Regions:
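Hydrophobic alpha-helical transmembrane segments of multi-pass membrane proteins
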Residues: 23-38, 184
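Membrane-proximal helix-loop-helix units in multi-pass membrane proteins
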Residues: 71-158
């Protein structure tokens, strides 16, 4: 996957594609590299190398909404992208800040809910059912938000910016594809909430396909804003 992602990044940049396309491919290729690194330090909890890989993996996830939305906005009409992009990037940046704040070990915030994605007692990359899993001791800053919606996302700001925000500018085809090939597929392949995000990231190959294939990209693009010509 690292080789495929790297080749896709170089190819799309060579073709003159926008940074939103090849930059997103490159960013998710970094995640594949982090997963390879995770296997080299697997279950070595307490070591600086394992903790570094785990923390970098979390930080990568925290900033994914920026790249996912940059990619998704390439799939909608240019006037729509220009009208929404500042708000979109602002909200994605806010989500990233919130996810960074969830790492603050503040007793006042409490702790994450056991069974929520990535929730763990100590920072460590460990063995999942068949893939790697990440244990992150994040705080309970957003537990009340999850409780209000009756969910256990752990990171509701991420879910909103990745799956709800693109709907506002009309990238519904991409959202549907991402939902099916991401969390839904991941949950069918593992019941481990700490392994699921790593499996989800593993299948970022779908974004690679969308970046490489003009036909595939057209099939998930929208020529209107919810049926309205702009």
């Amino acid at each position: 996957m690292v080789v495929i992602g790297g080749a896709a990044t170089v190819m799309t940049r060579h073709r003159g594609q926008s940074f939103a396309i090849w930059g997103t491919l490159g960013y998710f290729t970094v995640m594949e590299a982090l997963q390879v690194a995770g296997y080299r330090v697997l279950d070595q909890c307490g070591t600086s190398s394992n903790q570094a890989v785990t923390l970098l993996s979390y930080l990568h996830i925290a900033f994914q909404p920026l790249f996912i939305n940059a990619f998704a906005m390439e799939l909608v009409p240019e006037p729509v992208k220009l009208r929404f992009r500042l708000w979109v990037f602002g909200l994605c940046a806010a989500s990233s800040v919130i996810m960074l704040a969830q790492l603050i070990p503040a007793p006042a915030f409490g702790s994450c809910t056991p069974g929520s994605p990535l929730c763990g007692d100590a920072l460590c990359t460990v063995s999942g059912n068949w893939h790697i899993a990440w244990d992150i001791p994040y705080n309970g800053l957003l537990v009340p938000v999850d409780a209000a919606f009756g969910t256990r996302f752990g990171f509701p700001s991420y879910m909103i910016t990745v799956f709800v925000l693109p709907l506002l500018y009309g990238a519904w085809r991409f959202v549907l594809l991402h939902l099916v090939s991401g969390p839904i597929l991941a949950w069918t392949l593992t019941n481990n909430p700490n392994e699921m995000p790593a499996v989800w990231c593993l299948f970022s190959i779908v974004i690679v396909l969308a970046g490489l294939s003009p036909f595939f990209r057209r099939s998930i693009s929208s020529g209107t804003w919810w049926g309205v010509r702009v």
